[in-house]
C-alpha cells in the first residue's frame, strides 16, 4: 500500500513538473509579448511605421472590396474607374502645374494629380494600386515564411543527414540572385505572362525561403535542448507536434522581425518586376505598372513617375521602421 502511495506521489510530481514547465513556457511567452508591445509603444519610429502600415492596409482593403465584390461601384460613384478612360485630357499635369502641353489654368481639382497617357485619373490609380502592393507583400512573405520556417525547424530539430540535405538545398537557392530567380520562375511557368503577378508573388516567396530557414534553424539548435521540449519527448508527444507547438513558437521572434522587413522587400521587388513587364500587366492599376507607363514621359511630365515612386518609398519605409522597432524590442542588448 505504501509503495502504491509512493508511486502515485511520484506520478503526480512528474505530472506537475511537466505541467509547470509548459505553464512556465506560456507565462514566458506572454511576458515577452507584453514587453515587446510596451517597447513598441515607447518607440516613435516604430509607431510611425505602424501608422503607415495601418493606413496603407486600410486603403488596400477598401480598394480590394470595391474591385472584387462591388465591381468598382465606389470608384465610379465617387471618383473614376481606375482601369477605363479617358476621364479628361491625356497627360494632364497635377493641379496648378504646367508643362509643355498644358498651361496651369487647364488643370483641375477633379484630377488633383493629373491624368496618364490614356486620360485615367492618376490619384485613383494610385489608390487602387495599393491593394496590389499590400497583397503582394503579405502573400509572398507568408509563402516564404511558412516554407522557410518549416524547412529550418525540421533541419534544426533533427540535425544529422536531414539537416545536411535540407540546408544544402537552401544554400543552392540562396546562391541564386533574388531578382534573376524570380524572373526565371515567371518566364518558366508563365511565358505568356497572363498570370505574371501571381507567379511573381510565388517566385518572391520561394526566393525568400532561405532567409527564414537559416534564421530559424540557428534558433532551433538552442530551443530543442530546453526542458519543456525534453518533457514533451518524455511524455511521448510526437515530433511534429513538438516542432509545431513548442519549437517554432519559441524560435519565432527573430523570424517575425525578418517577415516585417521582407514585406517591404517584396513590395519593392514586385514593383520592379511590374516595371520590367514581369509583374502586373496592363490595364491593372499597380505602382510598378504606372512607372512602366511613365518611362517615356520622364522628361516632359515627370510627375507620372514621381507619385508612384513616393507611394512605394513610403510603404517600404513604413515596414522597415516597424521591423527595426520590433528588432530593438526583441533584443534587449540593443536597448540604451
Model region roles, listed by residue range:
Residues 115-116, 120, 157-158, 173, ...:
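Short helix-to-coil transition segments within interhelical loops
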Residues 150, 160-161, 238-239, 251, ...:
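Short coil/turn motifs that cap or connect alpha-helices
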Amino acid at each position: 500500500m505504501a509503495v502504491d502511495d509512493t508511486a502515485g506521489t511520484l506520478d503526480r510530481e512528474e505530472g506537475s513538473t511537466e505541467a509547470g514547465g509548459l505553464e512556465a513556457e506560456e507565462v514566458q511567452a506572454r511576458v515577452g509579448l507584453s514587453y515587446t508591445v510596451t517597447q513598441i509603444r515607447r518607440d516613435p519610429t516604430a509607431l510611425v511605421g505602424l501608422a503607415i502600415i495601418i493606413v496603407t492596409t486600410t486603403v488596400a482593403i477598401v480598394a480590394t472590396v470595391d474591385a472584387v465584390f462591388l465591381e468598382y461601384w465606389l470608384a465610379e460613384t465617387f471618383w473614376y474607374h481606375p482601369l477605363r478612360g479617358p476621364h479628361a485630357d491625356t497627360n494632364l499635369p497635377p493641379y496648378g502645374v504646367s508643362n509643355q502641353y498644358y498651361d496651369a489654368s487647364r488643370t483641375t481639382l477633379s484630377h488633383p494629380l493629373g491624368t496618364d497617357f490614356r486620360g485615367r485619373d492618376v490619384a485613383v490609380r494610385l489608390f487602387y494600386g495599393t491593394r496590389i502592393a499590400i497583397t503582394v507583400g503579405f502573400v509572398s512573405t507568408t509563402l516564404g515564411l511558412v516554407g522557410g520556417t518549416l524547412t529550418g525547424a525540421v533541419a534544426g530539430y533533427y540535425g544529422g543527414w536531414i539537416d545536411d540535405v535540407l540546408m544544402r538545398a537552401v544554400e543552392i537557392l540562396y546562391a541564386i540572385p533574388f531578382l534573376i530567380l524570380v524572373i526565371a520562375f515567371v518566364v518558366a511557368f508563365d511565358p505568356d505572362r497572363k498570370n505574371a503577378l501571381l507567379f511573381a508573388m510565388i517566385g518572391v516567396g520561394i526566393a525568400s525561403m532561405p532567409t527564414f530557414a537559416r534564421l530559424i534553424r540557428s534558433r532551433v539548435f538552442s530551443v530543442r535542448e530546453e526542458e519543456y521540449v525534453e518533457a514533451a519527448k518524455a511524455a511521448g508527444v510526437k515530433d511534429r507536434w513538438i516542432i509545431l507547438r513548442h519549437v517554432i513558437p519559441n524560435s519565432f521572434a527573430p523570424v517575425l522581425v525578418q517577415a516585417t522587413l521582407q514585406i517591404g522587400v517584396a513590395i519593392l521587388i514586385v514593383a520592379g518586376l511590374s516595371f520590367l513587364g514581369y509583374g502586373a500587366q496592363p490595364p491593372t492599376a499597380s505602382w510598378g505598372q504606372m512607372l512602366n507607363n511613365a518611362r517615356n514621359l520622364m522628361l516632359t511630365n515627370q510627375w507620372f513617375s514621381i507619385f508612384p515612386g513616393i507611394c512605394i518609398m513610403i510603404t517600404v519605409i513604413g515596414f522597415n521602421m516597424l521591423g527595426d522597432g520590433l528588432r530593438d524590442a526583441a533584443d534587449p542588448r540593443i536597448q540604451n
